[in-house]
């Protein structure tokens, strides 16, 4: 960064509370993306939980990770810009961290900037229960992110920060782009998602997390035989649905604003 001001085209989107900025008309493989993203996410800038860079039908996340909510947001933006969109349409997109094409079913939701977006999520690579110290966690690995499920009711009381530190240590010898920890309360089907992006060397508590809800859904299917549930997130809801061995995540998306951002 040489002191010049960069002007970027942005779209601010709210997928179930997980505020996402998409940057358009920019080199999606620019080496400064992590730095730019950190700046954009600040409270004094556009204030968001994550940033993605879009070109045609591809979404490149700030740390090269996969993100379900950003993918739902991107498909909803395509619908918002699509002159032929009326009530419902399917959009096929790709996202960093995932080699498969992603299919997203976008429907209207009461206003021209509001949608419901249902995405077919990637299959997990592995699903297991592990012990870290004396805590039991689910571990669901995807190609773009690994998610840990921490069942609050089935573990002894501890601080979330302690679990985050233990997970970082557990992964210290692994090459990964991002990990999540879903702090899950089975009594009221709610969760508090935490996501750490290695490239940025920082993590945040998100207001909702689609890939984390997917991981939780696979975990609940295997260990609790629950193949559909609306999971309450800190600032909204996401529903996972398992049909014919495929996992779908459905929920609201709102296009909030678009314009220029100065970095």
Swiss-Prot record:
Cofactor-independent isomerase that catalyzes the reversible conversion of L-histidine to D-histidine. May play a role in growth of F.nucleatum. Disruption phenotype: Knockout of the gene results in a small but reproducible lag in growth compared to wild-type strain during exponential phase. Depletion of metal ions from the media results in the growth curve of the wild type organism approaching that of the deletion mutant. Homodimer. The keyword Secreted does not apply. This is Histidine racemase. GO terms for molecular function: diaminopimelate epimerase activity. Belongs to the histidine racemase family. The gene is hisR. It comes from the Bacteria. It catalyses: L-histidine = D-histidine. The active site is at 67 (proton acceptor), 209 (proton donor). Its EC number is 5.1.1.24. Keywords: Isomerase.
